[in-house]
From Swiss-Prot:
GO terms for molecular function: DNA binding. Pfam families: SfsA, SfsA_N. Belongs to the SfsA family. This is Sugar fermentation stimulation protein homolog. CDD domains: SfsA-like_bacterial.
Length: 235
């Protein structure tokens, strides 16, 4: 995916109230914008960091600028959690997850389970439909190892439980972790920050839920799913 219009560079002042951030544009203008990320963004909110912003003059939009990328640990990291579903779709279509090939139809936001929606539903291959839950990843604390989650995610544990129920009902279910950075070679579950998620992941895998991860190449011009990386299944 490409950013259109192009992103603008700025310096981060602070991120606050979960959805807001203050920054200084390169022309010295002070701005407040919207941060489409409800997570902790652990390690990605350091004041003074170089960031990249989308901009929109769409009528009814409260904030013109949106927080898209930040420079951290010598690499660009995507922070917009509204993008991973689209990136997952692109990754599957590009054949980056070999076990999810040969599904001609990909539908989004399909209802399943107890008042839940699946991010992607793969179908039409003559095989069992595959329910794909997409998660955004951008947390790294050990060189080369991306981790999820970066904070407690009650909804995430619930999703794993419901995915396991799908498998028990004879369906196929997979987690797809989209890593919005390129400086990693594997993904692990961060059970020390969220033990409940760690246990739910272990249980889901033991019951037949599949797990895959894709890392992305990121520039101020766009984000491209680059390749699959292994998921450590032992928590």
């Amino acid at each position: 995916m490409t950013f259109d219009p192009p992103l603008v560079a700025a310096t981060l002042v602070r991120r606050y109230k979960r959805f807001l951030f203050d920054a200084v544009l390169e022309d010295g203008s002070d701005i407040t914008g919207f941060c489409a990320n409800t997570g902790s963004m652990r390690g990605l909110t350091t004041p003074g960091s170089r960031i990249y912003l989308s901009q929109s003059d769409r009528p009814g939009r409260k904030y013109r600028y949106g927080f898209e990328l930040i420079e951290a640990d010598g690499t660009l990291v995507g922070v917009n959690t509204s993008l991973p579903n689209r990136l997952a779709h692109e990754a599957i279509r590009a054949g980056l997850v070999s076990d999810l090939l040969h599904y001609p139809q990909i539908r989004t936001e399909q209802r399943y389970g107890e008042n839940s929606r699946i991010d992607l539903l793969l179908s039409g291959s003559g095989k069992a439909d595959c329910y794909v839950e997409v998660k955004n990843v951008h947390f790294i604390r050990e060189t080369g190892l991306a981790e999820f989650p970066d904070s407690v995610t009650t909804r995430g544990a619930k999703h794993l439980t419901e995915m396991a129920k799908l498998v028990a009902a004879g369906k196929r279910a997979a987690m797809l972790y989209v890593i919005q950075r390129q400086d990693c070679d594997a993904l692990a579950i961060c059970a020390d920050l969220d033990p409940v998620y760690g246990r739910a992941f272990t249980a889901a895998i033991s019951q037949g839920v599949e797990a895959y991860a894709v890392k992305c190449a990121i520039t101020p011009r766009g984000i491209i799913p680059a390749c699959g990386v292994p998921v450590r299944l032992t928590v």
